[in-house]
A protein has these predicted regions:
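C-terminal hydrophobic helical "lid"/dimerization subdomain
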Residues: 1, 273-324
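Glycine-rich phosphate-binding loop and adjacent beta-alpha segment
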Residues: 219-291, 324
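NAD(P)H dinucleotide-binding glycine-rich loop of Rossmann-like/cofactor-binding domains
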Residues: 77, 86-147
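Mid-domain Rossmann-like dinucleotide-binding core that forms the NAD(H)/NADP(H) cofactor-binding site
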Residues: 120-194
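Adenosine-nucleotide cofactor-binding segment
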Residues: 161-223, 273, 280
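Short, glycine/polar-rich helix-capping loops at beta-to-alpha or helix-loop-helix junctions
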Residues: 93-95, 172-179, 246-252
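Glycine-rich beta-strand-centered segment in the early N-terminal region that forms part
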Residues: 21-38, 48-92, 215
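Short glycine-centered segments of the SAM/dcSAM-binding site in methyltransferase folds
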Residues: 83, 142, 166, 232-233, ...
Length: 324
């Protein structure tokens, strides 16, 4: 089979298309014939060497969707031919096949395209964990989403609207703002405008914003507290810059006066119990149509380098996927 592998860390060009042996499942394992693989920003950080480095060569990717091709002994949750989305993989998903444990594959509704299945796990699980497990979001509250036209941003908007929240989202392009509005955000602002935070504050009303999903903390975090309502929460999902280059200053007194919380999160810290709740929500949302991942760009597997450049761009629009 063909697979993208990283033999050394560096720029996107290190993503190399290799011919490797087909995969065989062991006990409790499943081989999935890949129809689409999701591309996430974290994979660009690992590839470049600024995150913990896996042994090389390795195949990137933890998101994907396809059909079960083979199962190992003891597998009972899925059968050959089942449509599934992948939430983690033993072998990586930038490939024609992926090896997974039985618990890493989940039912993909017939109404969802494979590309949408490849776009569900990391963005939607991250948004769910940030909103409900870390941010303790509740119906009737107001959510502010920085960069709402990207994969996690869209997920946050859809999940929040389904939960009965008021949503204010940002995007820097007209196309992006239209997309955010189409996902159900009641208010959308242009975060390239100098006064966009003042506009957001006005839209939030006298009480302010209850929860902020922060995708670019090194740029925005110092200003976020001024938007918060009493006991408001900022959940930090993203921060760019190598090691200590992403530091910011905040006003502790502003946080004190609001009883505000700043909460960092990463999906890798989700507990098994968290993941059970997350996947129950995702499977149901895909089946009933309340969750509809938006695909921004599709690339052939051989163009993984271009896909990494696209997902690293500043003007996010939907999810980037690879098609083997």
């Amino acid at each position: 089979m063909k697979a993208i592998r990283v033999h050394e860390f560096g720029d996107p060009e290190v993503l190399q298309l290799d011919e490797v042996a087909d995969l065989t499942p062991g006990p409790g394992q499943v081989v999935v014939r890949m129809h689409a693989a999701g591309v996430n920003p974290v994979e660009t950080y690992i590839r470049s060497g600024i995150y913990p480095k896996p042994p090389t060569p390795y195949t990137p990717g933890s998101d994907g969707a396809g059909a079960v091709e083979a199962v190992g002994g003891g597998v009972s949750r899925v059968a050959v031919g089942d449509r599934v989305y992948i939430a983690g993989s033993l072998s990586g998903t930038y490939a024609e096949q992926a090896l997974c444990t039985e618990n890493q594959v989940h039912s993909l509704a017939e109404r969802a395209a494979f590309a949408q299945g490849a776009a569900i796990f990391v963005p939607y699980a991250t948004a769910y964990q940030a909103l409900f497990h870390c941010g303790h979001a509740a119906p009737g509250e107001t959510l502010f989403v920085h960069g709402a036209s990207g994969g996690v941003g869209i997920a946050g908007v859809q999940l929040a609207r389904a939960a009965g929240m008021t949503v204010i989202g940002t995007a820097s392009t007209e196309r992006g703002r239209q997309l955010v509005a189409e996902q159900g955000a009641q208010h959308v602002v242009d975060h390239s405008a100098p006064s966009y935070l003042e506009e957001a504050k006005t839209l939030a009303g006298e009480y302010g914003v209850d929860v902020i999903l922060e995708m670019l903390a090194n740029v925005n975090l110092g200003k976020d507290i001024d938007l918060l309502a009493m006991r408001g929460r900022v959940v930090v999902i993203g921060n760019r810059g190598e090691k200590n280059q992403g530091t910011v200053e905040i006003n502790p007194r502003a946080a004190m006066m609001r009883d505000a919380s700043i909460i960092g999160m990463t999906l890798r810290n989700a507990t098994p119990q968290d993941l059970v709740r997350i996947h129950a929500s995702l499977v149901t949302g895909l089946a009933n149509g309340t969750l509809q991942p938006v695909i921004g760009q599709e690339f052939p597997l051989a163009e993984a380098a271009q896909a990494h450049r696209a997902v690293s761009g500043e003007k996010a629009y939907g999810k980037v996927v690879l098609v083997p």
